[in-house]
Amino acid sequence: MADNSHTRVVVGMSGGVDSSVTALLLKRQGYDVVGVFMKNWDDTDENGVCTATEDYKDVAKVASKIGIPYYSVNFEKEYWDRVFKYFIAEYKKGRTPNPDVICNKEIKFKAFIEYANQLGADYVATGHYADVKRDENGRMHLMRAKDQHKDQTYFLSQLDYKQLDKVMFPLAGYTKPEIRKIAEEAGLATADKKDSVGICFIGEDGHFREFLSQYIPAQPGNMETLDGKVVGQHMGLMYYTIGQRRGLGLGGNKESNEPWFVIGKDMKKNVLYVGQGYENSHLYATHLEASDIHWVDDVVSRYGRDFHCTAKFRYRQTDVGVTVHLSDDDQMVTVEFDDPARAITPGQAVVFYDGEECLGSAIIDRAYSHDRQLQYV
């Protein structure tokens, strides 16, 4: 076994089971492991307990158990400036952002790496389910994890090969049940801790509307069909996303008992467009346009500006076949679908894959059905 004792790995520890086992596995492999808890948001739960404080206590328990030093670093300002302001700005435009993608790019793999360097890190590691592979030229590639259900390359798709050069993903070859078993057998305090869900600054109780209304004044308005018939009232366009069914408060009517879905928004008129039926044609797009393009490595030299690959438009979606057309100035990408795709949502990431490799992503701006732009924002 290689002597890893002179290689320092700084592990981002959240107080969850995945990052706990990440630190444990690296310690067992003989690395000089240091744990760091990132405090990105000042939050209290419904009992007035700061959830970050509770998570940090779990980090302390795990670090003490496996015998590694640990620190806490406060990234609240960086998170506010680089992630949260973006999140609010996108909602103001009527879009549905994915803050996890931006948080990984700006905080967990930028601010955190800079901090880890101050601790003398040779590498950083996180509990993400993903993998990295170095090619013959020494360039890093982002690869899917073994556990396809947990694979998180979707959220890591705006990283580049330089950021990945110093990154380890020790959970790449494990499934979630295996990770829980390792934690249990090692007696880690986080072994049975449930996975965190939702956005970190909203928490798991899901009071999304209440939270968002603190930052953006809600403007109620009409819910209409595309032919202008008013069928209800919306609470504020920012609360709805394309393809949404729940929370509309609309039942069937004499023409149809099919459920209603959000099929569009008009920000200028403050109208939420709704239509009946899961297969409603207004939910299906033939292509999209996206910007804010980030490739893990230079795709143009590998594939050219026009190429076929697969893509996801949301986390845990099955890959679909697409043809990518990259503009000459690299500012815009047009993505044509092999088959019409449902509920393409502006503000979300479209993430590109070649087999097991994640090539990168872009942020969706517009969706089209043939030549007609869908009324999505």
UniProtKB/Swiss-Prot annotation:
SS bonds (residue pairs): 103-200
Q: From the Swiss-Prot or TrEMBL record, state where the protein is found.
A: Cytoplasm
Q: Where is this region: Interaction with tRNA?
A: 150-152, 314-315
Which Gene Ontology terms describe the biological processes this protein takes part in?
tRNA wobble position uridine thiolation
Q: Which residues form the active site?
A: 103, 200
- GO terms for CC? cytoplasm
MF terms from GO for this chain are: ATP binding; tRNA binding; tRNA-uridine 2-sulfurtransferase activity
The segments labelled Interaction with target base in tRNA in the record are: 98-100
Q: Which UniProt keywords apply?
A: ATP-binding, Cytoplasm, Disulfide bond, Nucleotide-binding, RNA-binding, Transferase, tRNA processing, tRNA-binding
Query: TM spans, by residue?
Result: none
Q: Which Pfam families match?
A: tRNA_Me_trans, tRNA_Me_trans_C, tRNA_Me_trans_M
In this chain's numbering, which residues are marked as the site (Interaction with tRNA)?
Answer: 128, 348
Predominant place of localization: cytoplasm
Residues binding ATP are 12-19, 38, 127
According to UniProt, the reaction catalysed is:
S-sulfanyl-L-cysteinyl-[protein] + uridine(34) in tRNA + AH2 + ATP = 2-thiouridine(34) in tRNA + L-cysteinyl-[protein] + A + AMP + diphosphate + H(+)
Q: What is its EC number?
A: 2.8.1.13
* Function comment: Catalyzes the 2-thiolation of uridine at the wobble position (U34) of tRNA, leading to the formation of s(2)U34.
The UniProt similarity line reads: Belongs to the MnmA/TRMU family.
Alphabetized HAMAP family for the sequence:
tRNA_thiouridyl_MnmA
**Protein name stated in the entry:** tRNA-specific 2-thiouridylase MnmA
Organism equals Limosilactobacillus reuteri (strain DSM 20016)
